Amino acid sequence: MNPLILLGLALIWDLLLGEPPAKIHPVVWFGKIAGFLDNRWRRRGKIGFLAGAFVTFIIVALAFFLSLIPSYLTFPLDYLLAIYLLKSSFAIRSLYEHVARTVTEDIEEKRKTVSMIVSRDVKVLDLAHLNSAAIESLAENLNDSVVAPLFYFMLFGLPGAMVYRAVNTLDAMFGYRDERYEYFGKFPARLDDILNFIPARLTVLLYLPFGVKVLKYYKLARFKINSDKPIAAMSAVLGVWLEKPGAYRFPGREPRDEDIKRALDVYKLVVAEYLSIVFVLKVVQLCLNP
């Protein structure tokens, strides 16, 4: 299969139609299976760590073997399934729409929409911190939902994108340092850290056309925390503070509703920039290895 055609059609699907229905969405099923295993196998201590590692292995293996199925099919079924699977590994339109819904003057409605895209307790957040949380989610998920899966598609094809999405899903479900997931979630969380190390920093580089201030803010981010990097870059571009109380704070003025709109405009430009780079590199790769 031609990877340029595959990627192009998957992008058209994403931009025109958005996400597949939840009932047939591979990532949703990864989550359901992982949740089922979590309820039965989660333990504390070393046993919990091993159980979490085993669940990770199962879900990653499922994603990997699922991504191989198109190669055993004939045209056009091979393309149809591959496009569907690749599309499920990234979410450009869906991320934009979820964050756009947080733009509202009704603070209770804002709490409701922000709660759908962040894990923190929105009940204790004031208006500025709700705006900050929405922008932070957009910046972090630009890496998780766009840059990283397509980065691994570039390197390893469909299996790379699907395996990354599986690991990232497990991290989103179990990657918490609390009593429940301190041990069970440690393995998928560390694996997600490894897989996101390069993409998170690549995401920061995509912001450089907006100014070198991005590099100054990059230095303020915690070295070991990948998600800080894109958030720091977005803070620099918008000139607003972004804060997760007790974790990080990047300087600037107070974020407002209009700044969420500005962040969405930045998001569109960065995505367009990244997709242009991906297509150019893929063309070069195909020319060098026809």
UniProtKB/Swiss-Prot annotation:
Q: How does it sit in the membrane?
A: Multi-pass membrane protein
GO CC term, one of those recorded: plasma membrane
Q: Which residues cross the membrane?
A: 4-24, 49-69, 144-164, 269-289
**Major subcellular site:** membrane
Query: Record's Pfam families?
Result: CobD_Cbib
Q: Which residues form the signal peptide?
A: none
Instruction: Please provide the record's keywords in A-Z order.
Output: Cell membrane, Cobalamin biosynthesis, Membrane, Transmembrane, Transmembrane helix
Q: In which pathway does this enzyme or protein participate? A: Cofactor biosynthesis; adenosylcobalamin biosynthesis
Select a single GO molecular function from the record's annotations and give it: threonine-phosphate decarboxylase activity
Q: Which InterPro entries match?
A: Cobalamin_biosynth_CobD/CbiB
* GO BP, one annotated term: cobalamin biosynthetic process
Task: Tell me the compartments it is located in.
Answer: Cell membrane
Q: Which family does it belong to?
A: Belongs to the CobD/CbiB family.
Role, per record: Converts cobyric acid to cobinamide by the addition of aminopropanol on the F carboxylic group.
Q: What is this protein called?
A: Probable cobalamin biosynthesis protein CobD
